[in-house]
Amino acid sequence: MNIGFDMILAKLPEAYAMFDPLVDVLPVIPLLFLLLAFVWQASVSFR
């Protein structure tokens, strides 16, 4: 089981090379939601 998983993991780089820019952006998305919360609160005057 573990050997098969390692083989899948080894194949990931070439299979998903086109998604590399997407993976680089993914960690930023929660920060965007945090920023959106502040913008929303500012728009409703921090009720």
Swiss-Prot record:
Belongs to the PsbK family. The gene is psbK. PSII is composed of 1 copy each of membrane proteins PsbA, PsbB, PsbC, PsbD, PsbE, PsbF, PsbH, PsbI, PsbJ, PsbK, PsbL, PsbM, PsbT, PsbX, PsbY, PsbZ, Psb30/Ycf12, at least 3 peripheral proteins of the oxygen-evolving complex and a large number of cofactors. It forms dimeric complexes. This is Photosystem II reaction center protein K. Pfam families: PsbK. One of its GO terms (cellular component) is photosystem II reaction center. It is found in: Plastid, Chloroplast thylakoid membrane. One of the components of the core complex of photosystem II (PSII). PSII is a light-driven water:plastoquinone oxidoreductase that uses light energy to abstract electrons from H(2)O, generating O(2) and a proton gradient subsequently used for ATP formation. It consists of a core antenna complex that captures photons, and an electron transfer chain that converts photonic excitation into a charge separation. One of its GO terms (biological process) is photosynthesis. It comes from the Eukaryota. InterPro entries: PSII_PsbK, PSII_PsbK_sf. The keyword Membrane applies. It is a single-pass membrane protein. Keywords: Chloroplast, Membrane, Photosynthesis, Photosystem II, Plastid, Reaction center, Thylakoid, Transmembrane, Transmembrane helix. Residues 1-10 form a propeptide. The chain crosses the membrane at residues 22-42. It comes from Mesostigma viride (Green alga).
